[in-house]
């Protein structure tokens, strides 16, 4: 008799665990997310970029491309951090992949402006910087000036979300 109770309890536990796992995979108490893929109006925007590492420019490229896909309007990138060294001609070989992508964005209409103060502070002159960039008197003042002209300021903090799902659940990542 004890064996029958033990087997019944074991079966119940097995099925309840399987049911809970299926429930966790398929449902939460909140249901499914709503989808609202509406159109955005024309919005002129300025990306305020002040990175401590030029490698973060890779995330900026994707960020701008994704916003440009869904938001019509003009886009300006104001550079005033240490990322500016990536735009120096002497560093082209080191940063070529991202600089070429940014130059392609320029061809698509994205305007790149660099702070004169930051450029000089980093030890560069205008002649040292790639030709698709415009040097402006001051980065913060440029952002404020564009804001006064109706541009919306976008904090271009470089945070990539690609594959972030797998931080908590690495077992769900598809194998290559």
Which ranges hold each PLM region?
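Bacterial N-terminal signal peptides that target proteins for export
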Residues: 1-8
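Bacterial N-terminal signal peptides
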Residues: 8-18
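Secreted/extracellular ectodomain signature
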Residues: 22-176
